């Protein structure tokens, strides 16, 4: 499943899935389903076309789309994971360098490990409990929580510079493997 607005494309390019984003307010998204698992190993390879702008968020979610873990590539070349209200650094990425990410998740214990390019796995705890996971999401921006129930009915402002594209950020997903663990 993909979400691909005009300035946020999801397309195949050089045998990879490429997400590009030059929209100041929207994002590109690709979502892949896999067999429901309480314990799972997920491996994927990506290349970021830049390390000085753009954002890529990767989430494992349950069947209703509730995420339990999030890995982020930020605009400073850092790879982070969400740890409660804070973010924890996992390492750095470089523009145009392929990286392999391996995640092993145990939904029952809420613990997961992340390994970058075969490095020693870093232990982490999920920021939200889920019974199982069955989707991985790649998104070029933050999830939207606006408008919500508290948003005024009549809006008296417009978003600033919606007609001006920002510097294009590109991310290529080379492959994705999932495996249910015993």
Model-predicted segments: where are they?
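Short, aromatic/His-centered strand-loop micro-motif at the edge of beta-sheets
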Residues: 80-102
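Short structured motifs
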Residues: 26-31, 84-89, 159-161
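Extracellular/lumenal carbohydrate-interaction signature centered on repeated Trp-anchored short motifs
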Residues: 31-42, 90-97, 167-172
């Amino acid at each position: 499943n993909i979400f691909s607005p005009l300035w946020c494309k999801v397309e195949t390019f050089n045998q990879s899935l490429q997400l590009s984003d030059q929209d100041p307010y929207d994002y590109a998204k690709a979502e892949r389903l896999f067999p429901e698992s309480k314990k799972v190993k997920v491996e994927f390879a990506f290349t970021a076309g830049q390390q000085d702008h753009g954002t890529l968020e990767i989430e494992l979610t349950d069947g209703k789309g509730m995420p339990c873990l999030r890995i982020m590539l930020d605009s400073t070349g850092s790879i982070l994971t969400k740890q409660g209200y804070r973010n924890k650094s996992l390492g750095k990425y470089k523009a145009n360098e392929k990286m392999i990410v391996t995640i092993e998740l145990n939904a029952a214990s809420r613990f997961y490990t992340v390994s970058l390019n075969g490095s020693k796995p870093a232990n982490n705890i999920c920021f939200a409990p889920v019974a199982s996971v069955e989707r991985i999401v790649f998104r070029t921006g933050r999830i939207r929580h606006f408008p919500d129930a508290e948003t005024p009915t009549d809006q008296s402002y417009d978003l600033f510079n919606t007609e001006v594209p920002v510097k294009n950020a590109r991310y290529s997903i080379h492959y994705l493997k999932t495996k249910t663990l015993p």
